[in-house]
Amino acid sequence: MRSGYTLPVFACAGAIAALHWLRQRQSLQVGLVDLIEPAQMAEVPIEQVAGLSENMALAITRSDPGDNIDLTKNTPIWAVVEWGQGGGEQVTIKGGEGIGKQVNADNRAAIYSYAQRLLQANLTRLLAPEESIIVTIILPEGRSLAVRTSNSAFGVVEGLSLLGTTGISQPLSSPDQLDAFRSELQHKASLYASLVFCIGENGLDLARKIGINAEKLVKTANWLGPMLVEAEALGVKEILLFGYHGKLMKLAGGIFHTHHHLADGRREVLATHCALGGLSKQDIEIVFHAPTAEAALKHLKALDSSTGSDWVNQVYSAIAETIDSRCQEYMQSHSSRGTAATICGSILFDRDRKIIVKSKTACNLMGNLC
């Protein structure tokens, strides 16, 4: 299967082409981008370049994530570059139309650290010391595409994020992607007895912010099952699962590959634990038919607020304990020894990146992870 590039790479290539027009008044056919992560160069086709004024140019690229299930495939990325006034930052990066806003960070543009590094590194080297530019990234289809994502669950509204830690976009079903994650796990398992599994970038980011040692973080994407089995085989003593509740709760239903194209089960997990906890039939039905896990959580919060109950804590504590036990069972069933020595705990957070619950085991593990 064919890999491609992540959105920040196309944004960067467009910015390089727009800057080239400002300097040379010529259109580039290909933007050459240093990916940084990994250490290799990428040749990105440039669709169009136009001068908007003497001091401003626009270049357009088109997203190609490879053979990946990605709604950004073929979406256009615009990069507008204009000369700055000098002084301050050499490269100022802004988010235009279609770039999401972080509601929990003063509506700052959702252009995250890798994209920032990529743009800064590739553009600064093309500038003289006294020169400065302002780069505005625009996703014309970003606002409409964002409706089909879970971005709002992570506090990003009105558009898409320039997210990621690498320039390469591997197909979700690609063995190469799993091999890369396993390789990182093998390296970190040789250094630490306790590790933290994060499905995606939001988990990695929040884990760092609450004080977890970044060196102990391992990205799993949706491959939680194989990664748990690998960790157990490598002799990892403790694993903390740290993730968005709408993803991580799938493990409570025995779903160990969490991509939505393969399985869901969230409403079944939520409704089951509500029923086991004694929630009324009417409220269970509301939870079961909620359009998202976030909407179901909101209903439980409303119940707690109006009645003084403790349904959020009760239901989610039960889900977290089920996640822990299902993970133990999964590792044991796949262990060559017939038993699993690895201990699992779980922490679930909501759309506002606020922690909903920590399992009992997770509370015990935290001291070894910070």
Swiss-Prot record:
A GO molecular function held by the record: cobalt-precorrin-5B C1-methyltransferase activity
Reactions accelerated catalytically: Co-precorrin-5B + S-adenosyl-L-methionine = Co-precorrin-6A + S-adenosyl-L-homocysteine
EC number: 2.1.1.195
Keywords: Cobalamin biosynthesis, Methyltransferase, S-adenosyl-L-methionine, Transferase
Record carries keyword Magnesium: no
Alphabetical list of Pfam families matching this protein: CbiD (PF01888)
GO biological process entries: anaerobic cobalamin biosynthetic process; methylation
Top enzyme category: transferase
Pathway linked to the protein: Cofactor biosynthesis; adenosylcobalamin biosynthesis; cob(II)yrinate a,c-diamide from sirohydrochlorin (anaerobic route): step 6/10
Family membership noted in the UniProt record: Belongs to the CbiD family.
NCBIfam families in the record: cbiD
Protein name: Cobalt-precorrin-5B C(1)-methyltransferase
Lineage of source species: Bacteria, Bacillati, Cyanobacteriota, Cyanophyceae, Nostocales
Gene from which this protein is expressed: cbiD
